[in-house]
Structures are given as structure tokens and as C-alpha cells.
Amino acid sequence: MAGIKALVALSFSGALGLTFLLLGCALEQFGQYWPMFVLIFYILSPIPNLIARRHADDTESSNACRELAYFLTTGIVVSAYGLPVVLARKAVIQWGAAGLVMAGNCVIFLTILGFFLIFGGGDDFSWEQW
């Protein structure tokens, strides 16, 4: 039952993060849908770690494949935070919309991290807890 509660909490936090993102786009005073491009970063962020977890050997203390995956994931996450700032600096979107998108980024990336911390400990394909 603990797995179900964790899954419900993660889905609620994901919905909250997407609500912040949609508010940053759809409110009447903002009205620009350019910040929706951060959805691409949400989709891309777990992929390097999934690939590295699948192909990495855990016997070494330092693993180049896993460290490259951490580097790529960091670049994707920083890009998700940088896109609204660049759009706001170029006056494509307003700063209020950028703030809402960044709040959504925080919630979504913490949700992704929470998913892998809760459900990712075991084999490469150990999603059987839920």
C-alpha cells in the first residue's frame, strides 16, 4: 500500500507542476505558449540516466558512462531553467510567466527525482513496486 500512496503523491505533484506551467502560458495577461517548450526538457531529463543505468558496470567506483549521464542530465535541467529566462529577457514572455514556469520546473524535476528515488532501487527494470 505504501507504493500506491507514493504513486498518488507523485502524480499529484506532477499535476501541480504542470498546472504552474500552464498558468504561465494560459493566463490572460501572459498569453504566450512559448514556455511549453520546457516539456521537451521534462521528457529528455531522465533518458541519459536510464541509458547509463542499463549499460554501466557498478563494480567500479568511478564510472565514465554514469558521470557522462549525470553531466547530460544537468545540462538538460539547466536548459529547462534557462529557457524561460532567455524568453523573458528578450521580451517574448513576461517575467511573471517565467516565474510560474520556473516554479513548475522545480516541482516537476523534484517529482522526477522522487520517482527514481522511490521506485528505482533494484534491478534496471524494477518498477514492480507499483
Curated annotation (Swiss-Prot):
Keywords: Endosome, Golgi apparatus, Membrane, Transmembrane, Transmembrane helix. The chain crosses the membrane at residues 7-27, 32-52, 68-88, 99-119. One of its GO terms (cellular component) is endosome membrane. InterPro entries: Vps55/LEPROT. One of its GO terms (biological process) is late endosome to vacuole transport via multivesicular body sorting pathway. It is found in: Golgi apparatus membrane; Endosome membrane. Pfam families: Vps55. It comes from the Eukaryota. It is a multi-pass membrane protein. Signal peptide: none annotated. Disulfide bonds: none annotated. Belongs to the OB-RGRP/VPS55 family. Involved in protein trafficking. May be involved in the down-regulation of membrane protein levels. This is Leptin receptor gene-related protein. It comes from Danio rerio (Zebrafish). The gene is leprot.
